[in-house]
Amino acid sequence: MRRELLLERIDKLKATMPWYILEYYQSKLAVPYSFTTLYEYLKEYDRFFNWVLESGITNASHIAEIPLSVLENMTKKDMEAFILYLRERPLLNANTTQNGVSQTTINRTLSALSSLYKYLTEEVENEQGEPYFYRNVMKKVATKKKKETLAARAENIKQKLFLGDETEEFLQYIDREYPKKLSNRALSSFNKNKERDLAIIALLLASGVRLSEAVNLDLKDINLKMMVIEVTRKGGKRDSVNVAAFAKPYLEEYLSIRSKRYKAEKTDTAFFLTEYRGTPNRIDASSVEKMVAKYSEDFKVRVTPHKLRHTLATRLYDATKSQVLVSHQLGHASTQVTDLYTHIVNDEQKNALNKL
């Protein structure tokens, strides 16, 4: 989603929210949470507060009028009723017979509410230096995690990774084979953004950075001589990330055409640009997601930018067998998150079984 549209939708939601949600928003913006994360949280609060109005828990007529006391006095049974509502309500999509949202969506909703309750009961300060209230009902609400072993998850993910030679083959396919299938009109559009698209995909595959970290890169963050980039990690921390050498020619080629192709001036600091009616802008995450999906589906299987991050992590672990190194590359504080990659790279286990 374009940044301007995202901010417009955020403002629309904020206009309907109670004062304490607006305070929460400002507090998390200072952390900083990304606008995308805050937008998703606001959507969850909108869903929750609409249920509060419908359920008769409050006499308020509008979301903005729901008093803080409603959240303070919310019971465990109330929250369980909300979860049942999510699980059983008919979906708006007329093409499905399924009732209720998925467990993943429910967990996301509860995560957003947990964040809000933690803020209200622990983080915020009133005039006396105390939180608004102390009772956190979300601590009593259990979440159900998707039942899937790490090995099963790894096997599912493995089918959507470009491992071994496939990393370079994917880039070569976009460069040489993909344009052969296009009409003259589509080819013109492809050629305009070819160097940029290849540079973005090469960077994701060569560094493992998150999509948000890639699109927020500025020119000053790129050091092609050292093959290092500076990114802003989750929580606002700056980090230096090494980039594999195979991405260098793609990044250099994009840089050579960036200013002229996208009409960039010195004031246009964003590294990856898009151009509309002669005006350069920072490329948005939604455009990259669509671009990666388009190329990957034509090559092998439709994937997300996050799967390219998984690809780099898996290849790096396969080469080093070091979870610490992989964790550092991905910007994780612990190696627990990287356990997944030890299961994806399980050739030793399979070889042992084949010898039985």
From Swiss-Prot:
Transmembrane segments: none
Gene Ontology MF annotations: DNA binding; tyrosine-based site-specific recombinase activity
Domain Core-binding (CB): 16-121
Primary location class: cytoplasm
Subcellular location(s) of the protein: Cytoplasm
The keyword Nucleotide-binding appears for this protein: no
InterPro entries tied to this protein: CB (IPR044068), DNA_brk_join_enz (IPR011010), Integrase-like_cat_sf (IPR013762), Integrase_catalytic (IPR002104), Integrase_recombinase_N (IPR010998), Integrase_SAM-like_N (IPR004107), Recomb_XerS (IPR023670), Tyrosine_recombinase_XerCD (IPR050090)
Active site: 210, 234, 306, 309, 332, 341 (o-(3'-phospho-dna)-tyrosine intermediate)
Activity control: FtsK is required for recombination.
Domain Tyr recombinase: 169-354
One GO-annotated biological process of the protein: chromosome segregation
Keywords: Cell cycle, Cell division, Chromosome partition, Cytoplasm, DNA integration, DNA recombination, DNA-binding
This protein's GO CC annotations: cytoplasm
Residue stretches in coiled coil: none
Pfam families per UniProt: Phage_int_SAM_1 (PF02899), Phage_integrase (PF00589)
The protein's role, per its UniProt record: Site-specific tyrosine recombinase, which acts by catalyzing the cutting and rejoining of the recombining DNA molecules. Essential to convert dimers of the bacterial chromosome into monomers to permit their segregation at cell division.
Family according to the record: Belongs to the 'phage' integrase family. XerS subfamily.
Protein name, as recorded: Tyrosine recombinase XerS
Organism of this sequence: Streptococcus gordonii (strain Challis / ATCC 35105 / BCRC 15272 / CH1 / DL1 / V288)
